[in-house]
Amino acid sequence: MIKQSLCSLCVAVLLVSSSGCKDDIIGDGGSPSNIVFPVSDVSYSIHVQPLFNQTCALGGCHDDGTPDRVKLTSHSNVLFANPQVVVEGSPDQSILVLRIEGRLGQNMPLNRNPLNQNQINGIRAWIAEGARNN
């Protein structure tokens, strides 16, 4: 009886620990501190997409293989997402900003360390600058 209970407990722990995104993108679960945004002239290819790759797009959360979720794997996926998550020129109207700031629904990235203030400001600046594909 004790062995069966212990086995059931182990299975339950495995199931709970495997729920959510399929990979721990940042090995230690930490924030991607190696990505630093400038105050202005934010580059999608140098700053935004690498941040998405480390925190959102490639962990089974917002990648191309995950159905029914916003995909953050390319500029066109981000801009033409359904629902619309980026309103070019309007960070305060962008669901993406509201989610990473924790002002709408669950804070993103889900079950990971939040983005640091520089990264949040960088995403805001990128959107304010027109969410360019640069």
Predicted regions and their residues:
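Bacterial N-terminal signal peptides that target proteins for export
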Residues: 1-9
